[in-house]
Amino acid sequence: MIAVKELTKKYGSTEVLHGLTFSVPDGQVTGFLGPNGSGKSSTMRCILGLDTIGKGEVTFDGQPLSAYRAQRPHIAGALLEPTWYMPGHSARAHIRSIAQAAGISQSRADECLELVGLAGVQKRKIKKFSLGMKQRLGLAVALLGDPKHLILDEPVNGLDPEGVHWMRELIRRSASEGRAVLVSSHLLHEMELTADRLVVIGKGSLIGEYTMDEFLRTGAQPTIRMRVADPDSFVDATSRLDGINLTRQNDGSLEFASEAPDLDRRLGELARDTGAVVLEMTPQRAGLEQKFLDATGQAVEYRTQDRRGQ
């Protein structure tokens, strides 16, 4: 498990991280979310010891990463910005040189290229790689030591749909094998499919730490979408139900929301009692994108102005 406690970071006189405390448990994918400029990349660099921490501590299974010395590649693997390659090197030469420096076998380097789907282009120079191929190579390096903890910053950036699916499956499999996985992404739909839990920050401060289900349910009213054969009559009948908000959609469907947890039962009983022919009755849930915007609305560094109607 990765444990971050009271993490504070300054660049010059400007404090960019303000006492962050959260955990990345073993066996789960923890999504790391925040608006642009919120401090996600700085936090990841501090976790990995690439940036100096002002105050606080980061531990891997109870020990700072520096305590592991030669074992560090087996403790933490990371994919950050894929821009640190020697462009004239081949993929194979690149990963083998890193493996040699880390005391890892050349056969393991070749195995990792195979794992990320680059074995067929291992002799190609990196300067000819697409961004997605560089992402795969960066992941191969992260996996060299078969690490117990993975830290991935925007891992699906530059990948095509097949590559995004492949990356999701690899991340999920890594967690299912017992690893602690911390992953950031601006693709919120993909994060919703990948992460078990979320850490959300804004302007360098913790907004909250949740399971995915908790976050999606936060502040949400139960909402039911219905289609009925005679919507006007059913709408008239709903006037006998207290505490229900109705929105008529352009497609003819009816959307009901209520603070009451038994909304589906109440609507079902009303339909039965009035003889309404129900064509559809579907619970609705706000997606991760909308929940993220709601949670971080006061923590964005800048926002786009809506000029419609001006």
Predicted regions: what they are:
Residues 168-258:
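ABC transporter nucleotide-binding domain
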Residues 92, 188, 213, 231-233, ...:
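Alpha-helix N-cap/helix-start and coil->helix boundary motif
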Residues 65-66, 70, 103, 229-231, ...:
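Short, surface-exposed acidic/glycine-rich loop or hinge patches that mediate macromolecular interfaces
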Residues 96, 110, 171, 235-236, ...:
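Short glycine-/small-residue-rich flexible loop motifs, especially phosphate/cofactor-binding loops
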Residues 259-310:
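C-terminal coupling/interaction segments
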Residues 2-4, 9-202, 208:
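ABC transporter nucleotide-binding domains
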